[in-house]
């Protein structure tokens, strides 16, 4: 399996997971929106009765407050959804080294490192990954608690950081931004 195929498989799997998470988040957001609308309806009926008693000025003030409160409820729930699904995505990424695909991912990371920095670059992987790689030109050190590759050009001037921890941050940031935009639509 070529590096491009593995990367496409990883990207496809990632996109499928993102879609599943986004679909679940959209359903949850629709439910929240319905609850918000129901709450607004109830609040509006209460406030209409008060308006008759206290006048239109008070009514407008209360409705504005209810809308702000309802928006805050939705914002808080959306944040909870982002946190919840972000945590799930984070766990999937952190546990990549425990999957059967990790061997191929690790080999492709090494290939990418050598292609980018030259065949004589210094490639480091976790000591725990020693049994996964048969290449004798690899240094084994504890570089990252979640796995990956840290490569340096032979002269030490260029470093390619493919450690899971580094990649994870970027993926999660993009995931949360995309999920938030899907929820807002």
From Swiss-Prot:
It comes from the Archaea. One of its GO terms (biological process) is proton motive force-driven plasma membrane ATP synthesis. It is found in: Cell membrane. GO terms for cellular component: plasma membrane; proton-transporting two-sector ATPase complex, catalytic domain. Keywords: ATP synthesis, Cell membrane, Hydrogen ion transport, Ion transport, Membrane, Transport. InterPro entries: ATPase_E_C, ATPase_V1_Esu. Belongs to the V-ATPase E subunit family. NCBIfam families: PRK01194.1 (NF002264). Has multiple subunits with at least A(3), B(3), C, D, E, F, H, I and proteolipid K(x). Component of the A-type ATP synthase that produces ATP from ADP in the presence of a proton gradient across the membrane. This is A-type ATP synthase subunit E.
């Amino acid at each position: 399996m070529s590096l491009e195929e593995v990367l496409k498989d990883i990207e496809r799997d990632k996109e499928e997971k993102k879609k599943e998470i986004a679909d679940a988040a959209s359903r949850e957001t629709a439910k929240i929106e319905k609850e918000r609308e129901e709450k607004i309806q109830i609040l509006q009926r209460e406030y209409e009765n008060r308006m008759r008693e206290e006048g239109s000025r008070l009514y407008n003030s209360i409705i504005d407050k209810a809308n702000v409160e309802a928006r805050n409820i939705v914002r808080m729930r959306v944040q909870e959804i982002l946190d919840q699904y972000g945590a799930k995505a984070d766990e999937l990424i952190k546990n990549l080294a425990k999957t059967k695909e990790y061997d191929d991912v690790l080999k492709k990371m090494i290939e990418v490192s050598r292609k980018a920095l030259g065949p004589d670059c210094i490639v480091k992987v976790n000591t725990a990954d020693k049994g996964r790689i048969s290449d004798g030109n690899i240094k084994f050190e504890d570089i990252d608690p979640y796995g990956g590759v840290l490569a340096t050009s032979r002269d030490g001037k260029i470093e390619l950081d493919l450690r899971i921890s580094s990649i994870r941050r970027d993926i999660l940031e993009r995931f949360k931004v995309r999920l938030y935009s899907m929820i807002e639509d």
